[in-house]
Amino acid sequence: MKIKVSQLSNRVHEVKVTNRILRNTLKYQLSMAESDDVENKSFTEQLHASLNAVNSNTDFIVNTLNLNKAEKEKLDDLSFAETVKIATRVALRVQGLNDEDIDMSAKKADASKSKDEDN
């Protein structure tokens, strides 16, 4: 499968969806779900969870797309929100969704979010 991340380069990354890639995708998603559950944790545990979230996102992108040095540096210069968007898109692509489905889902989520904010 071909995945292009314009925020990092013009290169199209060829990703073969192997068991390793799928396993790493699921590990990434699990770590993100676990990092959301920090409400009843100590401040130190919350910091560790935040650091883990940053590392999990960047490591997932680097390893899945096999980024080169210049792309890794660009990734490190992005905001955390941009990095999460990229990681989420890559994970969904690995799981079989196409770009159009992902974009449509994101638009629906944004519309729902703005509705909730209006109420």
Name each model feature, range by range:
Residues 13-16, 20-119:
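Short, surface-exposed, charged amphipathic helix/loop patches that serve as local interaction elements
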Residues 1-9:
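Short, intrinsically disordered N-terminal pre-domain segments
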